């Protein structure tokens, strides 16, 4: 594996492979009818391109368009890297819908039933949320339930975003492992509890028997344990859409992590204003609202990766260097000479 041979040797082998097979790639492109001006050919990691990338990064950094932030992001446990939303795709996979009882604290024989496709994440639950208009749960709002297995009291909160028709109308809230729950957690100031790491293994402050298990194994074990406790109502076998890595098709894990982001919201505003003013026209016109919705709901774009091959982010975390120092001090060098971690 690349971890066994190390970064430098891995880069060397990738570089040699690219150089050896470049001519084959050109011939294949010509064979399929590609017409290109090969006098303008550039290798991805050509020093000239690297310089342009870093100059652009510097410019955007100074403008506040790129920044480092700790927020929830897609992580591929197999590739071991963060991914942007566009780097994932959705596939139909077999799964389960587990109906779990959360006992109401101080109320004998009363509980709130929660339906979830990911029982393993319940170990990191911070609340149970219900719709304030849902008469079934009005008496429980503001009270607490006992989080099964963890034996921890968590609040019952009210939020209008909860779909009363979905599942049981009550949802578990796991801010550390769901983008929707992350935003809900910020809104209600909920605790963030990480229970899954970047390798897709169970971790954190959880019972020892679950630590180190992959998420699927943990889900099965939890359901067995909940059943023994009389807290598992039923399990339905379902088919549902799962976000997977576009490279290896491994299901991604939403995990809170420090990454670098592009503030596309600021850029999207200009495009949105252009649409609404009529400066930009959409054909067919009926699709304009869909494009406006996309711009209105766009999220920060994660641009950092934990991969060893590609342009590297020109940022130091020690030594006092600034982002732009590399450009002046290392002009003409290849990217493999640039030593930084991100």
Regions found by a protein language model. Give the residues of each.
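Glycine-rich (often Gly-Gly/Gly-Pro-rich) flexible segments and glycine-rich loop motifs
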Residues: 320-342
């Amino acid at each position: 594996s690349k971890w066994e041979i190390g970064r430098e040797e891995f880069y060397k082998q990738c570089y040699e492979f690219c150089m050896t097979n470049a001519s084959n790639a050109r011939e294949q492109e010509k064979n399929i009818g590609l017409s290109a001006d090969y006098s303008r050919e550039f290798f991805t990691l050509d020093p000239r391109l690297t310089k342009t990338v870093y100059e652009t990064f510097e410019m955007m950094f100074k403008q506040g368009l790129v920044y480092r932030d700790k927020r929830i992001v897609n992580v591929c446990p197999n590739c071991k890297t963060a991914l942007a939303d566009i780097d994932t795709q959705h596939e139909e996979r077999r799964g389960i819908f587990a109906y779990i009882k959360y006992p109401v604290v101080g109320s004998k024989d009363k509980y709130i039933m929660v339906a979830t496709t990911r029982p393993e994440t319940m170990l990191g639950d911070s609340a149970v949320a219900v719709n304030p208009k849902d008469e079934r749960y009005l008496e429980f709002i503001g009270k607490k339930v006992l989080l099964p297995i963890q034996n921890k009291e968590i609040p019952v909160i009210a939020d209008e975003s909860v779909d009363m028709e979905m599942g049981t109308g009550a949802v578990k809230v796991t801010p550390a492992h769901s983008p929707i729950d992350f935003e809900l957690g910020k809104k209600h100031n909920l605790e963030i509890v990480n229970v899954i790491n970047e390798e897709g293994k169970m971790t954190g402050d959880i019972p020892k028997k679950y630590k180190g298990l992959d998420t699927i194994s943990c889900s099965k074990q939890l359901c067995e344990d909940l059943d023994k406790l009389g807290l598992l109502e039923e399990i339905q076998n379902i088919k549902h859409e799962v976000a997977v890595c576009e490279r290896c098709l491994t299901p991604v894990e939403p995990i809170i992590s420090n990454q670098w982001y592009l503030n596309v919201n600021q850029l999207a505003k200009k495009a949105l204003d252009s649409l609404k003013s009529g400066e930009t026209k959409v054909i067919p016109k009926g699709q304009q609202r869909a494009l406006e919705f996309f711009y209105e709901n766009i999220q920060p774009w994660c641009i950092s990766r934990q991969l060893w091959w590609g342009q590297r982010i020109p940022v130091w975390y020690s030594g006092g260097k600034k982002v732009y120092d590399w450009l002046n001090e290392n002009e003409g060098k290849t990217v493999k000479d640039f030593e930084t971690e991100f």
